[in-house]
Regions:
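Hydrophobic/aromatic residues in alpha-helical transmembrane segments
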Residues: 87-91, 139, 172-173, 217, ...
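Secretory targeting signals
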Residues: 23, 30-31, 68-76, 119-175, ...
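Transmembrane helix boundary and interhelical loop/hinge segments in multi-pass membrane proteins
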Residues: 88-108, 122
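Aromatic- and glycine-rich beta-strand/loop motifs that create alpha-glucan
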Residues: 1-22
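Alpha-helix N-cap/start motif
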Residues: 114-115
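Terminal transmembrane helical anchor/hairpin motif
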Residues: 11-14, 28-68, 188-262
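Long, hydrophobic alpha-helical segments
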Residues: 71-96
């Protein structure tokens, strides 16, 4: 528990910056929607003629001239990218920073085995992702309160639940990368999160690449799909949870056998 508290304290500044940036941007866009509503109606007509581009961004399912459509396409995209990048960055640094910073020897002096250190490190990743989501969603709700509008509660919860699963999957895979590396691979993990997003776009636009939807967690957590259908593809969400568990198990095996640099 002491190690968990230490990690939360060390990452407090980072999580505040990310949560306020992502949540504040989303809330600000919600507050701006009323003033942009008329121009959004004109943009809806323009986007409807853009074929594959509209399909990639979900504008063939939702109208951005409505609050639900605007949130499900524009704001959901900002939240998804911001959340995945935060999860990737958090997972990427959690284990490897000890080797890079030559603090493994200090950890070895604590009355904790590798198994407990690993457990509390991963618990810190999960808790940081949960705190990020809590803070950003609170800011988003403040935005809705200020705008005097609110989306369907069930769909809103489904979307953010799917996003949480997506972020935990990305964070867990990057946690595995952290276990494999002696240095923080933050750049590579941020790039990995972006590649997953690009894969989601490509599988929606290029029929031959449709199989990528089974690879990228952005597909089942896509805001436009969830707000248009009112449901989550739970089969894919369950597969994401399996990938998450396998990543953590693999990371544990690697970490237990690893020759840690002091």
């Amino acid at each position: 528990m002491t190690l968990l508290k230490h990690e939360i304290k060390m990452n407090l500044k980072s999580i505040l910056i990310w949560a306020i940036s992502v949540g504040g941007l989303c809330a600000g866009c919600i507050l701006l929607f009323e003033s942009l509503e008329e121009s959004m109606k004109e943009m809806t007509d323009a986007y409807s003629d853009m074929g594959a581009f509209s399909a990639a961004l979900g504008m063939d399912k939702l109208s951005i001239s409505t609050m639900e459509g605007f949130y499900g396409t524009e704001i959901a995209l900002m939240f998804a990218l911001g959340g995945a990048m935060f999860a990737a960055m958090t997972g990427a640094a959690m284990l490897s920073k000890e080797e890079e910073g030559h603090t493994c020897e200090f950890l070895a002096t604590l009355p904790l085995g590798r198994g407990r250190i690993f457990f509390w490190k991963y618990a810190a990743v999960v808790l940081l992702v949960l705190l990020f989501n809590l803070m950003t969603v609170l800011l988003i709700l403040v935005g809705f309160a200020g705008a005097g509008e609110m989306l369907d509660g069930k769909t809103f919860v489904l979307y953010h639940g799917a996003q949480l699963i997506m972020q935990l999957e990305v964070g867990s895979i990057c946690f595995l990368i952290s276990a494999l590396s002696k240095k923080k691979q933050i750049g590579a993990c941020l790039g990995f999160a972006m590649v997953l997003y690009i894969s989601d776009l490509m599988c929606r636009v290029i029929p031959d690449l449709e199989g990528l939807k089974y690879v990228t967690p952005y597909y089942f957590s896509n805001g436009a799909d969830i707000f248009a259908s009112g449901e989550v593809q739970w089969g894919m969400a369950a597969a994401a949870l399996v990938v998450m568990v396998l990543s953590v198990v693999a990371a544990a095996v690697v970490y237990q056998k690893k020759d840690l640099a002091s």
